[in-house]
From Swiss-Prot:
This is FMN-dependent NADH:quinone oxidoreductase. Disulfide bonds: none annotated. Homodimer. Quinone reductase that provides resistance to thiol-specific stress caused by electrophilic quinones. It catalyses: 2 a quinone + NADH + H(+) = 2 a 1,4-benzosemiquinone + NAD(+); N,N-dimethyl-1,4-phenylenediamine + anthranilate + 2 NAD(+) = 2-(4-dimethylaminophenyl)diazenylbenzoate + 2 NADH + 2 H(+). Its cofactor is FMN. It comes from Marinomonas sp. (strain MWYL1). Keywords: Flavoprotein, FMN, NAD, Oxidoreductase. Binds 1 FMN per subunit. Pfam families: Flavodoxin_2 (PF02525).
Length: 197
């Protein structure tokens, strides 16, 4: 049975265009994988704690020396990483907030970026260890895809690649506050999804 892990990060709920695109993909994926399982991780509905000095202290303390509080901190990332490792396919949906990704999604990235689990250091640089396929669903209000101020999609693509996820495709509904151009971008992204699944 194939497992799809979806990570949503928009605060707009079902009004979110990035989430609607992800829904479109999941619906078509389930039609082709009727026995498939979808694991949903909504980092806005259930936000993760942001990194603090205590977080770093817990991660860099040897396991046998961790306090109960430190063990609880590390367990957050352990659960997220286990979801990644168990998935066959990963999808990420995200809006653009002030030129970048939501802080809740950045917090997710911080928790799953763990040396020895999701990536490793080598003499030639870091190597990702997750080794899954992934898709990205992005939306923005005032900018169309490829705008120079886009620090959203490149950030997600770079991070996913860093931990070993192979981004098969990215579906972007840019310009959602721009009227017709935004509608066209959303419809084009939906059409691309129909072909990609």
């Amino acid at each position: 049975m194939a497992t799809l892990l979806r990570i949503d990060s928009s605060a707009s709920g079902e009004n979110s265009k990035s989430r609607q695109l992800a829904n479109e993909f999941v619906e078509k994926w389930l039609a082709k994988n009727p026995e498939g399982k979808v694991v949903a991780r909504d980092v806005t509905a259930n936000p993760l704690p942001h990194f603090t000095g205590e977080t770093l202290g817990a991660l860099f303390t040897p396991e046998e020396n961790r306090t109960a509080e430190q063990q609880a901190i590390v367990a957050i990332g352990d659960e997220l990483i286990a979801e990644l490792e168990a998935a066959d396919l990963v999808i990420v949906s995200a809006p653009m907030y002030n030129f970048g990704i939501p802080s809740t999604l950045k917090s997710y990235f911080d928790h799953v970026a763990r040396a020895g689990r999701t990536f490793k250091y080598t003499e030639t640089g870091p190597v990702g260890l997750v080794n899954k396929d992934a898709y990205i669903f992005a939306a923005s209000g005032s900018f169309l895809a490829g705008a120079p101020v886009d620090h959203q999609v490149p950030h997600i693509q770079t991070f996913l690649g860093f931990i070993g996820l192979n981004v098969k495709d990215t579906f972007i509904a840019g310009g959602q506050a721009m009227g017709e151009p935004g509608e066209d971008a959303f419809n084009q992204a939906k059409s691309q999804i129909a072909v990609a699944v």
